[in-house]
Amino acid sequence: MLPYTPLYYPILPPLTIPYMKTLIQDAVIINEGRSFVGSVLIDGAFVAAVYEEGETPRVDGATVINARGQWLLPGVIDDHVHFREPGMTHKGTIASESRAAVAGGVTTFMDMPNTNPKTVTRREWEWKMARAADTSAANYAFYFGGSDDNAD
């Protein structure tokens, strides 16, 4: 088994996925600057282990996905998104856009402050953090905008 530091942030919030073990077997894994054939064990919402080819143990009760010939990459961090909540939810919300991001392999996003109202006060930033805690399907961060009104 490769040395591996467990993730401290869930791939998805625990409320959105049932607890289960999943073994993705025989994929071409891209990680840490190299590619190799191996397997990944997911325990609940966390990556529990990464195995080189031929080292994969039998995991009782796990759903096994045969990924032979498929590529398996770490989740993408999108550091520049415009989710438009609050104020322009007809264009998108944290809930809708984070789910779309996860469907495309993005596991973390960083949202820009140009919403309505703009995220230029602690109050607006805390509102977005609380909203994401309740609705986001991905890990998140929010930029804080600078303006003439908050230069201090």
Feature roles, as predicted:
Residues 17-22, 28-74:
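Histidine-rich, glycine-flanked metal-binding segment
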Residues 21, 34, 103, 134-137:
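Alpha-helix termination/capping residues and helix-transition junctions
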Residues 114, 146-148:
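Active-site-proximal loop/turn and secondary-structure-junction residues that shape catalytic pockets
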